[in-house]
Amino acid sequence: MIIFILLWLLLVLYSFTRQDLNLTWYNQLTTPLQTLGWYQRPLVTLIFIFLSLLFFSCYLYCLRKHSTPGWNVLFLIAFMGIFAYPMFSYDLFNYLFNAKMILIYHANPYLQTAIEFSPDPSLRFMQNVHTPAPYAYGWTMASLLPGLVWFSGKFTLAFWAMKVFIAGFWLGQLWILKKLVTKLFPVEPWRFWLFALNPLVLVETLINGHNDVVMMFLALLAYMFWLNYAKLKAFIFLLLSASIKYATVVLLPTFHLRGGKLDIPAWSSLALLAVMFTRPDQLHSWYLIWAFSFAVLAKPKWLVSLFTALTFGALLRYTPYIYFGHWDPPVYFLRNLIWVSSLVLTPLLLKFFKA
């Protein structure tokens, strides 16, 4: 587990190779890493591949040897991730600015766009400044809590507050998963650690700071209430989940079923995977967290193996972006080729989980 923590620390440090050149943040410490990331792309690509493969290998080793940590280590992992730079996405900056628009500028991010506040220095290192908020109202309201830190006038404090907020929901999701795994699979505790230590989940949540765990925390809480025959609470929390990012609304039909009629986690994971393909031009890696959150609770181990394999490919598919430095062709094709190719790991992982 010490090696796992060290590799995680290296990934946290690696994240600063992608720091936007317009963001003068920790500058004395991060300038060498920025130079590596932006001007030595072949080398930084090899480093990413090497770190990712090592991290996944250590992840599987910990699962095989049952070398799993206590909650204190999970808190340490979360703490380290708070200080990382969101290396593969600018979404976190949009979360922050949407909250700032409401709290500081008294503007509606669904009717106005960030570009209308061009004097704000945050726009120097933001993307998608010409579009209104794409998230559901539930997330925008929730983001106002960490957004209150904007009243300090300090960007760094607001950034850390948002990271802490998202890390808190990651820990909350783990708490619910622990209860669900204990209830549904008392002799297979590895299912919990399969999600808790998954490299894709850690990178996309604790480094990149995506809000998907907020949606999935509420969805899994709804499922837990459903298992306990609290249908009204389940329905309410599922609606709250959909109010974050819409996707989990597809789970509503499954909450009308009960007993042995259907493996809810299995079908939920497949339904959420299908949602990803409704916008094939935006097959973002972090969307896989939706399906994987339920896949670890699915009864068929082949399905667990398939989704675990997809998480491997979902992280490695950033490789073309790092190498080319943009998202234009041939990056889109290469990214999806890597992702599809990761399916060849499914039978190997199936043997691994059955061993």
Language-model segments: what does each one mean?
Residues P42-T45, Y137-T140, F151-G172, L180:
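Loop-to-helix entry region of an early transmembrane alpha helix in multi-pass inner-membrane enzymes
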Residues T68-A161:
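Intramembrane catalytic core of multi-pass membrane enzymes that act on lipidic substrates
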Residues G172, I176, V214-A230:
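Specific aromatic-rich, kink-prone transmembrane helix
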Residues F4, L53-C62, W160-L184, M216:
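Transmembrane-helix motifs of polytopic, lipid-linked glycan transferases
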Residues M1-L51, I264-L288, F292-A355:
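Transmembrane helical bundles and short interhelical boundary loops of multi-pass, membrane-embedded
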